[in-house]
UniProtKB/Swiss-Prot annotation:
One of its GO terms (cellular component) is cytosol. GO terms for biological process: prolyl-tRNA aminoacylation. It holds the Pfam family tRNA_edit. Consists of three domains: the N-terminal catalytic domain, the editing domain and the C-terminal anticodon-binding domain. Homodimer. The keyword Ligase applies. The gene is proS. The lineage of its organism: Bacteria, Bacillati, Bacillota, Clostridia, Eubacteriales. This is Proline--tRNA ligase. It is found in: Cytoplasm. Keywords: Aminoacyl-tRNA synthetase, ATP-binding, Cytoplasm, Ligase, Nucleotide-binding, Protein biosynthesis.
Amino acid sequence: MKMSNMLVGTLREVPAEAEIESHKLMLRAGLMRKMAAGIYNYMPLGLKVIENVKNIVREEMNNAGAQEFLASALIPAELWQESGRWDAYGAEMFRLKDRHNRDFCLGPTHEEVFTDIVRNEIKSYKQLPLNLYQIQTKYRDERRPRFGVMRSREFIMKDGYSFDKDQEGLDLAYEKMRKAYVNIFNRCGLDAKAVAADSGAIGGSGSAEFMVKSEVGEDDVVFCTACDYAANIEKAPSTPEHAEKEELMEVEKVETPAVKSIEDLAKFFECSPKKIAKTLIFQADDKVVAVVLRGDREANEVKIANAIGEVIELEMASEEAVKEATGAAVGFAGPMGIKVDMLLVDQEVANMYNFIIGANETDMHLKNVNYGRDFEGIVGDFRNVTIGEKCPECGKEITISRGTEVGHIFKLGTKYSESMGATFIDEDGKAKPFIMGCYGIGVTRTVASIIEQHNDENGIIWPLEVAPYHVSVIPANVKNEEQATKAEEIYNELRKMGVEALLDDRKERAGVKFKDSELMGIPMRITVGKMIGEGQVEFKLRNGGEVETLSIEEVYNRVREEFERANLSL
C-alpha cells in the first residue's frame, strides 16, 4: 500500500476522552474513530490488525477441530425465553420490536442460537462430538462504556460452542480449547494467564478466564506467590481469620451520636475494626438482602449473588429501603431484628466474639454481640480475599494484581440443552441432553490489550504477526528521483517476497514520516536516503536497536531474519 492513496489520519495531540494508552494510541495512530459512546468505526489500518487477529483465531480454532459458522446477530426473543435468560440478562441486552410487534434482541452472546441449530440438525450420538464457532459483532448496552474498545457497546468476538455425548467428551473439548487459546494469545504477543472464574450469566460449572496483567485492568486477579494457582477475585475463596476465643459477655446498647463509619466506630470504642461487624443492605431484584461482614472486609457481590440465586441486578439498597429494613438512619444497620428477605453472614463473623454491630436504631450500637446466641443467618464466604491470605491449593501467601479479560471458557453442561429440549439419541436408543461447552475471545479487546503491553512514548510496537504492515519503506526525499525510484523498487520486491509493505510516498518531511511509522507501530523501517547512490539503505526495528546501514540485498535478508525470529514463513 502507498500512503499517498491511503485513508490514514494520525494525531499529534492526545484526544481528551481517551484515558488509557490503548485508547489514546488507537485514536492517534488512526486505527479507529468514535461514532458514539462505546461505538467506533474502524479505519483501514485498524481493520487490518483486527483481520490479522481474526486469522490467528481462525487458524487455531480450525486446527483444534472446530468448524466456522455465522449466525444472525438479530435473535427472536423466543429462544432467550426458552433458556430463561430473556429476563435474567438484564439491561445490558439491546432489545427491539419489529413492525409486527415481535420482540428481538441484538445478540450479546449466542448460546441459545447454537443450541437451537444443533437440536434441529444433530439427532444421534454418531454425529458427535461437534464444535462450532463464529467471529461476529456483539452488542451490549454497557452502563458506562469506557477505555475505548476495552468496554464498548459494540465489539467483535469469537464465540464457540462444543456439543458432546458425555462429560468425558466435554472435558476433552475444554482442554483442546484451552490449548488453542494459549496458542492464540502467544501468537498475538500477549502474556495471558488462565485463571479460575465465576460463570456469571452464561451459567454452567467449570470456568476459566484468560487474563492479561494490566494496571488499567477492570478485574482483580489473585495469584499464589508459590504455586500456579490463579483466580478472578470474584471466584477466589477467602480464608477466615479465627478470632481468639473469649468468654461471652452480655449485650450492651451504647449511644453513638453521628458515629457511622467503621473508622469512627473503631476510634469511639477504642478497638480494632476486626471487632466490628458491618451490615450492608442490598436490593436483589425484588428482594432486600443484608450481608454481615467484619468491619475491615469488602463485600464480594458475585459470591453474594450466587448465594441468593438467579439475580438479574444486585445493587446497594436505597436510603428508603434501608430505613424500612432497620427503622433507623443509614449507618446504624445490624443483624439483630433486621427486616430483610435474606440475612447472609460471612463465615469470619460467625467465628468472632463479643463484637460491635449497629442497633437498628439511629445513633445507637450494640456491643458484646455473638453469632448463634444473638442472631443467625446463612453462613458462607461473601467477601473479597486480601493480599497475604493463604492460597487454597498450597497454603502459601497470595498476591493481587489488576488484569484485563481477553478470553473465557466455560463448561456449560446441560444448562441450555435441558432448558431448550436439545437432545440426541445415545447408544442405548435413549434421548439425552447435549453436554455443552462455551468459548469466547474478545477480538477487539485483544487488539487493545496488545497495545497496552506493546507501546512506548513514540507509539505502538506491534508484534510482527498482528502488525498492519511488516515494513515501512520511506524515501527520505520524494523529490529526489533516485530515492523515490529505489524506494518503490524495494517496496515492490518486498511484496513479491510476501511481505506486507507500506511505501510512504507522501510529500512530507522525513521526520514526519518517521514519527508516523513509529506511532503506527510498523515493526521494521527501511529508509532510502543519501547513501542510495552507494547502494546502501538504513534499516531499523521498531522495538529498539540501532540504525543499521545495509546493502539492498542485505536488507532483504534482514527482513527474512525477523520473520524467522517470529516463527513466520515467507
